[in-house]
A protein has these predicted regions:
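Acceptor/aglycone-binding surface of glycosyltransferases and processive sugar-polymer synthases
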Residues: 57, 64-72, 76-86, 91, ...
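Acidic helix N-cap motif at the loop->helix transition within catalytic regions
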Residues: 17-21, 49-58
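Short helix-capping segments at alpha-helix termini
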Residues: 30-36, 59-64
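Short beta-strand/loop segment that forms part of the nucleotide-sugar
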Residues: 10, 23, 34-46, 68-69
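A conserved acidic beta->alpha catalytic loop
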Residues: 44-52, 99
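N-proximal low-complexity "stem/linker" segments adjacent to membrane-targeting elements
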Residues: 1-28, 35
Length: 133
């Protein structure tokens, strides 16, 4: 039986310091979730630091890592849209590389989709509780 795939879309702008930490955490979570396959789709949004170089290295080491690189900065929404257009997973999550939201939440969100029967799940971090959207 074919495993379902989760695509993790990660818009990136000048994330050279965050990427190694984020990748380590998301890779750890993916190994814990043996029932699923993963795709890590990073979107480099015209970064001026070593973000693109790090993404190239990660994609050579891990065939689950793919990246798109913009020649200039289009903003986070442009990166999210490009990621959504290119994701190949059965499920999609958008995460920030700075780990504002912990990658471990992927397990909870996947459980809620599969076991609770939701069509869509979202995360609201404790630091955002009380904000009016």
């Amino acid at each position: 039986m074919k495993k379902e795939k989760i695509s993790i879309i990660v818009p990136c702008y000048n994330e050279e310091e965050s990427l190694p930490i984020f990748y380590k955490e998301i890779n750890k979570i993916s190994k814990e979730m043996k029932e699923t396959d993963f795709e890590f789709l990073f979107v480099n949004d015209g970064s001026k630091d070593k973000t693109l170089s790090i993404l190239r290295d990660l994609s050579k080491k891990d065939d689950r890592v793919r990246f798109i690189s913009f020649s200039r900065n289009f903003g986070k929404e442009g990166g999210m849209y490009a990621g959504l257009e290119n994701a190949t997973g059965d499920y999609v999550a958008i995460m920030d590389a700075d780990m504002q939201d912990p990658p471990s939440m992927i397990k909870t969100m996947y459980h809620d989709i599969k076991e609770e029967g939701y069509d869509c799940v979202a995360l609201c971090s404790p630091q955002h509780v009380g904000y009016n959207f």
